[in-house]
């Protein structure tokens, strides 16, 4: 049985970030929104638990600070264009998590009931995988 490569994607933000481990088929294995202070511990845990082989990092807000920390893990770091990823993440979150009558509202009128940075991280991973396949 060949093992799929797992990548860790990080959507960097000022006080919080989205993190997700995605396999090379694009399946999210774990995703969560964490405080910036939890970054090291979470990354360490995900690398150990999911045999992560590569880190994907969004190229905008605070990415330099994040890259400096992520370098400590001595894995390849790939920068990914974050353009419109927050909008895509918000829409995906709303599509997958709207319940009851909220589902009847157009996506643009719905409001997420929690931060959705983890969905943005999954989208960054998908962008990296799509670029790698070309």
Map each language-model feature to its residues.
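Phosphate- and other anionic-substrate recognition elements at nucleic-acid/protein interfaces
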Residues: 2-10, 14-134
């Amino acid at each position: 049985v060949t093992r799929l490569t797992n990548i860790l994607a990080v959507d960097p933000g000022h006080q919080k970030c989205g993190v997700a481990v995605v396999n090379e088929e694009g399946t999210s294995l774990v995703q969560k929104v964490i405080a910036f202070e939890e970054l090291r511990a979470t990354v360490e845990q995900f690398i150990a638990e999911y045999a992560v082989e590569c880190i994907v990092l969004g190229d905008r807000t605070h990415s330099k600070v994040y890259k400096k920390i992520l370098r400590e893990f001595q894995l390849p770091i790939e920068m990914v264009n974050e353009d419109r990823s927050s909008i895509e993440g918000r829409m995906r979150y709303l599509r997958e998590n709207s319940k009851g009558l909220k589902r009847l509202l157009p996506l643009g009128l719905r409001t997420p009931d929690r931060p959705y940075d983890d969905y943005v991280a999954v989208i960054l991973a998908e962008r990296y995988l799509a670029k790698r396949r070309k």
